[in-house]
A protein has these predicted regions:
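Hydrophobic structural segments
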Residues: 1-205
Length: 205
């Protein structure tokens, strides 16, 4: 399959128009007409991921966080961004990133997290727009299908996502009281805390 065809599939799933204005998703290096048989998925296009892609003979590297956010004035091996780009291009590995568009698009990260936690009455935490009549945005807010205490919810999150542990701040607030409304954000989430409070969330995940 051509790189172009894979990108068409990815952008049908998570259109670049769903990304935040400051973001930079898309094909960041490589050839559109590249024949792709093997893809390496990674959170970050760091040195280890780039070397691993070359080691396994990957034709395409797909990351969540873009390697390039700001305009690049030069590409050389004198800085970490240039070094990785040069390495990928020399190895003929096409590099694509899908970040906040994948976080926010309908059916993607925000929906997956909320569905796995059985949220009802789901709404985008930060509304960004509509796609085919469906509202989308960063994060989700909703009512828990079954009220539970803070510790119970922490265990639910841990189990639902197969995590070795979770970190809880303010655990004493709902230690013995039921949580009925929660909000999630598939990222750092610092800028969404106020939105979570406005939405009436008792817990922010």
């Amino acid at each position: 399959m051509k790189c172009r065809e894979i990108i068409e599939i990815l952008e049908t799933l998570a259109p670049k128009s769903c990304a935040c204005d400051w973001d930079n998703p898309g094909l960041l290096a490589g050839r559109m007409d590249k024949d792709v048989e093997k893809i390496l998925l990674t959170l970050d296009a760091d040195d280890a991921a780039v070397e691993r892609a070359k080691e396994i003979g990957a034709d395409m590297l797909l990351s969540h966080h873009p390697l390039i956010f700001k305009p690049v004035k030069h590409v050389s091996d004198e800085d970490f961004i240039g070094r990785r780009l040069v390495s990928l291009i020399q190895a003929d590995v096409s590099y694509y990133a899908m970040h906040t568009n994948f976080d926010s698009a309908p059916g993607c990260m925000a929906d997956i997290v909320a569905d796995r936690l059985n949220f009802v009455d789901q709404k985008p935490l930060e509304l960004m727009g509509e796609l085919s009549g469906t509202a989308y945005g960063i994060g989700k807010t909703g009512t828990l299908k079954k009220p539970m205490t803070g510790p119970e919810l922490a265990r639910e999150v841990k189990n639902r996502f197969g995590l070795p542990f979770v970190t809880v701040y303010g655990s004493e607030l709902y230690e013995n009281e039921p949580v009925t409304r929660a909000a999630t954000c598939p990222g750092a989430g610092g800028s969404e805390i106020r939105e979570a409070l406005r939405a009436g969330a008792q817990v922010f995940i």
